[in-house]
Amino acid sequence: MKGDFAPKYARILDILPSIAECADGKLVLVGGTALAIFHLKHRLSVDLDFATLGDDDEAAKQALKGCLSAKGVRAFRSKFSNQFIIHFEDTSIKVEVLPPSFKVNKPEWREVGGSRFLVASIEDILRMKETAYAERKEARDLFDIMFILKSRGEPHLRIRSMIKKHGAPKSMERLAAMVFSKEDFEEFGREVSDASKTGS
């Protein structure tokens, strides 16, 4: 783990109990952080993404931000209307509340610091990650997809198909700094290389 990623991840773990309490069963943690902390523990993640169970993402964002601020968390507006930034002495974390169009079909309850907390299921995260890779081709999204498939004992053929359809992943160096296991990253690199060579 290199650069700024380790302190960000540590701060996410520190603040999760407060996040869980403030989410109040109305927000669902999604994305790489949900996958990494609650499902696979395969890499670190450095931001917090939420889907709302209601139809007003702005109100949900403001409620979360206000609750955290009341707990003494330093939360500030972002240049993007659906985000805010939590500042710590050594780093900062982006918090984003996605629009209601991002649906979570099977949220799961988890216990965090004595509070119940909704987290997206691995099936929901897989669906969202496939959409994300098609849109931005980030290596971390494809890495997450590969390890979801691996956790379910499924072959990696879908990885090769996605590379063929959408192109090779970018930001491999950034991903390398996020992955816990060097062997996992090397396995992913081989899959990407083989897919690029065979075109299938």
PLM region spans:
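Compositionally biased terminal segments of proteins
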Residues: 1-200
